Amino acid sequence: IHRPLWQPAFVSIGELMERLSGLRGSDRVKLITELYKVYSRVHDESFDTFYFWGDMLLADFDQIDKYLIDADMLFSNIGDLKALEGDHSYLTDDQIRVIRQFWQSFGSGSSCSDEQRHFLTIWESLADIYHRFRESLSAQGLAYEGMVYRAAAERLLDDEAVALPGDADGRYVVVGFNALSACE
């Protein structure tokens, strides 16, 4: 290169999603603290006990949103194996078999261990926790990454007019992606 060049404008995928969604991501500790506030309204557990599970739950919620999964369907009571008889074409036969084995291990409510009953109690409240957590974050203008991505994707899917950052002539170059989520 023998002359000065201008660098084009660029943004990371995270920055782009934040601009498209109008939400801003928050740090993990803040998110887990907010999740605990919602969770503790339903389950009596100390923050110390919750933190490990809260981190896992936050990661699960993140994946649910990044892949545009219907949380209500996911967290429905699939202990009733008839739920698996519907249209689950997105599952392989092996996945259906594993899910059935998992839920059959619980047997009837009377034959469940204390741990299994505790798990079922939590499982049955996860959809409500998921929705309340998202509402709480939205009210504060906060979000976790998957929530940001889902909001951006839903705005675009709804044909909402969204101003994309970048070239005035509308040219965009996307680089560096390996595996994309449904939102991306």
Where are the regions a protein language model picked out?
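Conserved P-loop NTPase "ATPase switch" module shared by AAA+ and STAND
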Residues: A168-L180
